[in-house]
């Protein structure tokens, strides 16, 4: 039996990339610190008890008109002016670079923003850096069901990087990771 070759890439998994990554972060024990730092604004947030699945789900934006109650979004940029001191995580497919007709490289952006007055933690680290490092720890090389293996690797994708973003009072970092898809 001859295997049938797909003629062209459809990138059918692209719309579910953000959700699948969040699903992985909600169930991975090493990602608990991310959820604590998103929910709690105090300098000792990392010492708080782990969140329940229900508490984590309550932080994820579901399309309501008011965004202020949420911390996790599946698109780019801050849509509304933030009036409270909090931390925000945005995860979305940013770019697709076709490699050939059946496969391409999808760059996933992870934007972490926090109000400058709550960025420093009592253990002499910063909220933004801890979240970015934990995202790499949990997701680099992880097989995200239905999407593929995420990677942070300059040899595999010259687009992977971390850069500083934001403006006062919200500062942040952008992590770019990649996944092959077709």
Name every feature range the model reports, one short phrase each:
Residues 1-100:
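Small/polar-rich, solvent-exposed N-terminal microdomains that initiate assembly or binding
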Residues 6, 119-126:
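Short, flexible/disordered intra-domain loops and linkers
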Residues 12, 126-129:
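Soluble non-cytosolic domains of exported or imported proteins
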Residues 82, 128-182:
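Acidic-leaning, charged glycine-interspersed low-complexity segments
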Residues 86-88, 105-107, 170-176:
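Extracellular structured ligand-interaction cores
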Residues 92-94, 109-113, 176-180:
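Residue-level recognition of well-ordered beta-strand positions that form the cores
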Residues 97-105, 167:
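Short glycine/proline-enriched loop/turn "hinge" motifs that connect secondary-structure elements
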Residues 103-120:
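Short acidic, glycine/tyrosine-flanked loop/strand segments centered on an H-E-D-like triad
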